[in-house]
Curated annotation (Swiss-Prot):
Native source species: Caenorhabditis briggsae
InterPro entries attached to this UniProt entry: 26S_Proteasome/COP9_Components (IPR050871), PCI_dom (IPR000717), Rpn6_N (IPR040773), WH_DNA-bd_sf (IPR036390)
Domain PCI: 212-381
An example Gene Ontology CC term for this record: proteasome regulatory particle, lid subcomplex
Assembly information from the UniProt record: Component of the lid subcomplex of the 19S proteasome regulatory particle complex (also named PA700 complex). The 26S proteasome consists of a 20S proteasome core and two 19S regulatory subunits.
GO molecular function: structural molecule activity
BP GO annotations: ubiquitin-dependent protein catabolic process
Role according to the record: Component of the lid subcomplex of the 26S proteasome, a multiprotein complex involved in the ATP-dependent degradation of ubiquitinated proteins. In the complex, rpn-6.2 is required for proteasome assembly.
PANTHER family: 26S PROTEASOME NON-ATPASE REGULATORY SUBUNIT 11/COP9 SIGNALOSOME COMPLEX SUBUNIT 2
Entry keyword GTP-binding: no
Protein name (database record): Probable 26S proteasome regulatory subunit rpn-6.2
Name of the coding gene: rpn-6.2
Alphabetical keyword list: Proteasome
Length: 411
């Protein structure tokens, strides 16, 4: 294929020249030209151009037959979905898929319509439109169960589970994952789908059960599965969550050895692995400052990733509370500004954390709003004076009771 840029006019000319009498070689050349143009448009981030292409070659779909046309449309759509997305690109991708689904529906291309809808569910997850993804996923799952299209059902159920997880509905997430597992056990599932099932299983075990050992095993299976088919992107994601499990198991000292193995070494420079390693290093050093720095510098990987965020928030809170407890321990009253300065934070979040500790009864004390100080109460039963006072009160009570009894007898 020539390196000269392809034009829409050239594609349309080639398509119009093809008819039922065209040879297989001519049809194949036309297909290659269409895909080359779609790839070119994707590099130019021209999703609108791809949508125009899809519409302008509709006559060609009838010429090549349903199965071949379906594959061609899906390939063109995939090129469009590789475009890096801002808000505009996100909307354009969704519109492109919806338009293709409408065409498939109106032309009774049911298999194509279902496969495109499944891809749209995955796109909704990618662009964080979880409510829309869950709605479409549930509708499509019902249809696929009736048709017993198990492979597509596995794919849709996994995406449906992801939607529910991101919407904090763990019950629905587990139900959808169970559907995917049941389908994969009763029918052949591709390595890609089996790895996806393992990955989502690890996510839910870590989020709900807090069973990080089992989660690690699932993530490792997913890592191996994705690695075996050369899916480096998803394999990196699985490795990232393996490291997260080691952090949650308080086994961060094992991470360097794990990352030095032959199968893992190629992934070490990935931004996702660099980010989770920064969090692991901060946790190992018990440094709240470094932990907060890691979250700030790697916001996309550690804060916007729901799987990590569920656990990093708990880790951050635990580390912050330990730091505050360590600072205030020697004092009966201490300035908020001093606590904030020592732990490397500003006063407002420090005050908020202390207020939460007081409400959770993790700290016996109060915040003096006038003096901007924290007053720490002595622990009940912690002083000898308090114990002696209780003993004295008990003895006095006995004396009063005896005196009262004697008074009644005298009367």
């Amino acid at each position: 294929m020539s390196s000269t840029p392809v034009t829409l006019k050239a594609v349309q000319s080639e398509v119009s020249a093809r008819n039922a009498k065209s040879s297989e070689a001519e049809v194949k050349r036309c297909e290659d030209l269409i895909l080359s143009y779609a790839k070119q448009l994707a590099k130019e981030k021209d999703i609108t151009g791809i949508r125009t292409l899809v519409k302008s070659i509709q006559n060609f779909y009838d010429l090549v037959g349903k199965a071949r046309a379906s594959k061609l449309i899906r390939d063109i759509v995939e090129f469009a979905l590789t475009v890096e997305q801002g808000k505009q690109e996100k909307e354009e991708k969704i519109d492109l898929l919806k338009n293709c689904i409408e065409w498939a529906t109106s032309n009774k291309r049911e298999f194509l319509r279902r496969s495109l809808q499944a891809r749209l569910v995955r796109l909704y997850n990618d662009v964080r439109e979880f409510t829309e993804g869950q709605k479409l996923g549930q509708e499509l799952s019902k249809e696929l169960k009736k048709l017993e299209d198990r492979e597509l059902l596995i794919e849709v159920s996994i995406e449906e589970s992801k939607c529910a997880f991101n919407l904090n509905n763990l019950s629905k997430a587990k139900t959808a994952l169970l559907t995917a597992k049941t389908s994969s056990n009763s029918a052949f599932a591709s390595p890609q789908l089996q790895a996806a099932v393992d990955m989502q299983s690890g996510v839910l075990y870590s989020a709900e059960e807090r069973d990080y050992k089992t989660s690690f095993s699932y993530f490792y299976e997913a890592f191996e599965g994705y690695g075996s088919i050369g899916d480096k992107v998803n394999a990196t994601g699985a490795l990232k969550y393996m490291i997260l499990c080691k952090i949650m198991l308080n086994e961060t000292e094992q991470i360097p050895a794990m990352l030095s193995t032959k199968e893992v070494l190629p992934y070490n420079t990935s931004p996702r692995i660099v980010a989770i390693r920064a969090m692991a290093d901060a946790f190992r050093k018990r440094s709240l400052k470094d932990f907060m720095k890691a979250l700030e510098e790697h916001k996309k990987e550690l804060v916007e990733d729901k799987v990590v965020a569920v656990h990093s928030q708990n880790l951050e809170r635990t580390m912050l509370e330990k730091e505050i407890s360590r600072v205030i321990e020697p004092y009966s009253e201490i300035e908020l500004s001093y606590i904030a300065r020592v732990i490397g934070m500003t006063v407002p979040p420090t005050e908020k954390a202390i207020a939460r500790m007081i409400l959770d009864k993790k700290l016996m004390g109060s915040i003096d709003q006038h003096g901007d100080t924290v007053v720490i109460y002595p622990k009940a039963g912690a002083t000898k004076q308090f114990t002696r006072a209780l003993t004295t009160i008990r003895e006095l009570t006995k004396t009063v009771d005896v005196s009262y009894s004697r008074t009644k007898v005298i009367k």
